[in-house]
Amino acid sequence: RGLGDVYKRQIQEPEWFFSFRSHPFNPEAGSVGSPEVESMREMMTEQDLSGFPRKGFTRNYTWRYHKDLGYGDHLERYGEVKDIETYCKYAQVVNYDQYRSFMEGWASHMWDWYTGILIWKTQNPWTSLRGQMYDWSLDVNASLYGTRKGCEPLHAYYNPVTRKAGLLNTTLKDYTDLSIVARIYNLEGKLLWEKETRASAKANTVQELLDIPVPEGIKGAYFLRLALNADVPNIYWLTTEPKDYT
């Protein structure tokens, strides 16, 4: 239930998935999943939509009826949530980061803390606002893409607790001579730091390979780009300010 029976059903900090030890095999785990604004408008009137939660507090009966889970202050970290369009846009950013962190955090402890996990649930049989990757209208939200990225069979990832880049191999095949390139950019796209390492990966293993520095001369948000064998990169938005990405 939620992300596991040992804690409340609620959104978690990305770091939490790497540091909190839950059930070794969890067949029922999930998190937030608010859809995009088009689906929201199919559920509620504009008056009800204008009562969107602020800093995680549901202020409207209709939102409670549709089982709004709440995002805490995670949306406000990206700026002022001034209307329902902004609410849904920021929610997609958080949905992606939440589920990617979820998958990467658990996989980073595979065969040590965990043996497996199942997402519950991918969809709802009604117009609900929680625990879904596609909604009643069959519209996909960003939770699906975060899960898909975090579940890549051979995957470069970032651990926000150790501040290291690592390599996950959840396949049954050994790999050799792999290239991982880490790059840090500012918000204008200027390259601030770059490092490459080469590694091998045994089947069903995880390893941490690179220390990721905090870039000098940056205050606020910046990007970390991890590319494995020049494939589709894994991009993180990080910050020097506590939970402020504005």
In which residue ranges do the predicted regions lie?
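Short, flexible loop/turn segments at beta-strand junctions in immunoglobulin-like
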Residues: 214-216
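Substrate-binding clefts and catalytic carboxylate motifs of secreted carbohydrate-active enzymes
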Residues: 11-176, 181, 192
